[in-house]
Amino acid sequence: EKFKPINMFKQLMLLGAAAQLGIFVTFLGALWLGFAPPEAGAIGIIGGADGPTAIFLSSKLANGVNMLADGTLVKNLIGPIAIAAYSYMALVPVIQPPVINLLTTKHERKIKMRPPRSVSRLEKQLFPIIGLLLTAFIAPSALPLLGMLFFGNLLKESTVTNRLANTASNALIDTITMLLGVTVGASTQADVFLTKDSILIFGLGAFSFIIATAGGVLVAKIMNWLSPKSNPINPMIGAAGVSAVPDSARVVQNMGLKNDPTNYLLMHAMAPNVSGVIGSAVAAGTLLSFLM
């Protein structure tokens, strides 16, 4: 069911890619502030709004163990990056609405989109397989992230592994979440977290979310201009390309209802929202392959 919105609105996958602009702009910003390239790459991924991806990339690039070309060690930024990523994911309902309002008109916010089409069982089962193969070619370094995402979806959609799907989506994920919280928390000692770098990381994280939201909205506006009048695109759904699932999609839904109580955009917004998860993992794999 996770990828059902993408199958309904395949053209909206582009918005999931557009919102990754925040990652690469923040990467350049971190370089400008004096961070080493691997550290800047790990900081940039905060804009992907995906906590596990941020932890994965920072543990590879900014782990305090890797050595730079000049012989110095990279800084251990796992704790500050993880906390910044999860903090701003929780603040999506605060960060995104002002950006959306700034970049869209009241008329655009009232645009109603076509209702979703039905998706066959075969489509649901083929999507994770094809998606895994394509992303394996594009960003093989991201396979630990994307492989688990697509595998979990396939467990659910196959309908023959219900026990495994239930375990993975309940007991297993709860256990892993607890372990993840404990291990990240243990890495945030005062000498690591209470530093000038942490302040810069939090500032860059906020900047990254704003740029990602703006990038998604602006590309959605362009898509709306290019779309036929019979199939318009509400520019607000571009903000859902920020892969905080499902918070970004809910922000778009609430703003749509606020401007028109009969305008339901949740399923439309979930398409770029879920594709943003894939996009952030591909971006992480790209950074990893260049910066390791």
Language model feature labels by segment:
Residues E1-P5, Q96-T104, L154-N166, G216-W225:
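C-terminal ends of transmembrane helices
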Residues K75-V94, F202-A212, M236-A240:
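Alpha-helical transmembrane segments
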